[in-house]
Amino acid sequence: MADLLSSLKNLPNSSGVYQYFDKNRQLLYIGKAKNLKKRIKSYFSIRNNEITPNHRASLRVQMMVKQIAFLETILVENEQDALILENSLIKQLKPKYNILLRDDKTYPYIYMDFSTDFPIPLITRKILKQPGVKYFGPFTSGAKDILDSLYELLPLVQKKNCIKDKKACMFYQIERCKAPCEDKITKEEYLKIAKKCLEMIENKDRLIKELELKMERLSSKLRFEEALIYRDRIAKIQKIAPFTCMDLAKLYDLDIFAFYGTSNKAVLVKMFMRGGKIISSAFEKIHSLNGFDTDEAMKQAIINHYQSHLPLIPEQILLNACSNETLKELQEFISHQYSKKIALSIPKKGDKLALIEIAMKNAQEIFSQEKTSNEDLILEEARSLFKLECMPYRVEIFDTSHHANSQCVGGMVVYENNAFQKNSYRLYHLKGSDEYAQMSELLTRRALDFAKEPPPNLWVIDGGRAQLNIALEILKSSGSFVEVIAISKEKRDSKAYRSKGGAKDIIHTPSDTFKLLPSDKRLQWVQKLRDESHRYAINFHRSTKLKNLKQIALLKEKGIGEASVKKLLDYFGSFEAIEKASEQEKNAVLKKRN
């Protein structure tokens, strides 16, 4: 405690970020402050050189403070910089006591550029800095279904490069376009179609009515398969905003955020109102073993959502709960980010309070539906058996695949909320000379990406204790807290024993080795994760091998033999690089003597 006491006595009065560590140098918490000295000292009570938690703090904070052995600070110019740095470090390092929300992906917007002669609806996630652009959204889902419907219902220009081609295409022949490329429609006539398109984007009911008419016409012509496509699309568009009953007389543009939860679980609901109508909504489930702080979670939710420059910003942001201090910080952050004043408030009456109540009602409903499943019980049992500090809500599983150390590849699969998240899977081409070097490269590349994609609760490695130790070393050097287990086949005569029916899996943790019965649900859970990563990696290896064989065949046709192909690969690194190289460069490599 001498180090901690010394640090507490020499704190700066500057703005910055502070980090708390336990006696094992494990990161406990990251926070930010306008005045580091004032903020950090508020956690502690110091009497006669004895440090104790501030008795006015919450039980969650007091529990954390009892574990603090060291602290570090990072000084910045101002509170805005501190807020942004704090959020970035939390996502990258994932401290034990911070609430970690998923990175808020920018939702898509539909836009039309009326500065062009023939505007068409398109999707964007970025601001297009040009006059005449009209945005609609954000859409948490269904944007593509709306876009596809508009192009099928209206004779719009179907492709961005159509006008440049100066020649009517197949869409004109099937009466899906009026061929402005050949001046078969005037700008004024086309603008009427574009305005009708706008009306359909703004009025979902009108769009659905047009789709229903189209579906009925197809059914009457016995074109049932096409009619089914429209039926499914109507269902998707109807689900875009489940709160469309909320239609206010005042044309508010509002974003609404509401949290509901207990000490270790919560739900965040986001609703987006444009022109007095709720146009879309989304929710996120949050888990935390070390307590839930609404203020901290709200702060991270707002920063995650607004730190990217969004095309449309509301005039006001409504929250269900937040301290005055955090509310002020967030308002300054957003106003600074978008160079205009945007109000954040916690409504107490009227229409805006009713909106918060609807968001809360939905958060409560989603929360109540999350019953404890068998999978949750298995997770809890696995956590207890493997002595994991955190519940493995998000798991990343790694495997490598190669043939005689050629076509070396690796795969990462992700398991979250009791399901495989295929959108988060990653593939890697590897250069390692053996399975250990390949796993080291795979894990290192993932760790280097923690700033962009925050680390999970748990890594599962397909391998033995050697691979487990490689993972632990990489995580230690990254400064991130991720727990690790590995699963391998038992060995006989120093080789993995894989005879059918005889292979037994062994689970390795940093402190133990487990040989569980095949019927053990905890073993089966880890096996399920391992098998998916193995399937993913080996499929990538096979496709890579097939692609390489085709490339070798093409090179052979050009008179380049296998030995020469190997020489070129060793030098250029890939077939793509060989293709890009000039004949002179390739000849120079082939003429070199080893």
From Swiss-Prot:
One GO term (biological process): SOS response
Disulfide bonds: none
UniProt domain GIY-YIG: residue ranges: 13-99
InterPro entries: GIY-YIG_endonuc, GIY-YIG_endonuc_sf, GIY-YIG_UvrC_Cho, RuvA_2-like, UVR_dom, UVR_dom_sf, UvrABC_protein_C, UvrC
Chief place where the protein resides: cytoplasm
Signal sequence annotation: none
Gene Ontology MF terms: DNA binding; excinuclease ABC activity
GO CC term, one of those recorded: excinuclease repair complex
Cellular compartment(s): Cytoplasm
Domain UVR: residue ranges: 205-240
Keywords, sorted A to Z: Cytoplasm, DNA damage, DNA excision, DNA repair, Excision nuclease, SOS response
Function as written in the Swiss-Prot or TrEMBL entry: The UvrABC repair system catalyzes the recognition and processing of DNA lesions. UvrC both incises the 5' and 3' sides of the lesion. The N-terminal half is responsible for the 3' incision and the C-terminal half is responsible for the 5' incision.
Quaternary context: Interacts with UvrB in an incision complex.
Family note: Belongs to the UvrC family.
Cited NCBIfam families: uvrC
Protein's name according to its UniProt entry: UvrABC system protein C
Species this chain originates from: Helicobacter pylori (strain P12)
Highest classification ranks of the organism: Bacteria, Pseudomonadati, Campylobacterota, Epsilonproteobacteria, Campylobacterales
